[in-house]
Amino acid sequence: MIWHTFFQPFIEFGFMRRALVVCLALSLSTTMLGVFLLLRRMSLMGDALSHAILPGVAVGYLLSGMSLLAMTLGGFIAGIVVALVAGWVSRRTPLKEDASFAGFYLGSLALGVTLVSLRGSSVDLLHLLFGSILAVDRDAALFVSGVASLTLLCIALCYRGLVSEAFDSAWLQVNHRRLPALLHGLFLALLVLNLVAGFQVLGTLMAVGVMMLPAVAARCWARTLPGILLLAAGMGALCAWLGLSLSWAISLPAGPAIVLTVSALFFVSLFFGTRSRLLVGWRTLMG
């Protein structure tokens, strides 16, 4: 039973192997970005940007159909533009950056759905919103793997700066005047790039789930930042494997099955995590 559910599909079927490789690559890169979003108290920014890329993806779709290059380029440009404009608005107005993102992403989501509806069918819209992980081809797998490798390399090279900017940006601003802006720009670019890569697999609505939920779950267990990063990546990879296996075994949509698996791990961590222990606190309160 265990062999047939969790191992045999990936040995026998090439599309399952490609889906697993892509999910593992995304788990390594997006979860680490999710941890840094958590440290910055900007957890909803990932959700906002995942919606913000939809108009660019839709424009690429209108111009070139289901072209990987066109939709990727359009989504990346749209995400960067929204991030820059939201940052500019937050500096020029009393609004904070997360509030600016909230305003822009709602309009972006509506615009993207409208653009796709001009040409596509409901099937095309569902593909863009929820992805089609089992239909990932070789080019998409290479693209996602390349994005994950680039992200891990950038995090390794800029780790100290990213940590300093997340915990004490004022100190970094005093000692290195231009560095915080450069690090923030790099972080946003990596965030948008990973969301665009995730859209190829899980769609714009589901991609952020793989980014944020393992990060939050890991925070309930680990005490140190390296521990949170490693645990989040491991949780993301484990849930990707379990989600794909369960989707195969009981005929569930693969993308939602993965996100549901991560959600289940999040709730377990919330109640039983050594840093959370919500259940123990609830029993103490009731007792």
Would you name each region that the model predicts?
Residues 252-287:
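Cytosolic-side transmembrane-helix boundaries in multi-pass membrane proteins
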Residues 153-187:
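Membrane-helix/interface signature in polytopic inner-membrane proteins
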Residues 35-50, 54-122, 218-230, 247-250, ...:
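Short loop segments and helix-boundary regions at transmembrane helix junctions
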Residues 201, 205-256:
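Transmembrane alpha-helical segments in multi-pass inner-membrane proteins
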Residues 20-25, 72-77, 102-103, 141-146, ...:
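Hydrophobic alpha-helical transmembrane segments
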Residues 1-28:
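Membrane-interfacial amphipathic/re-entrant helices at transmembrane-helix boundaries
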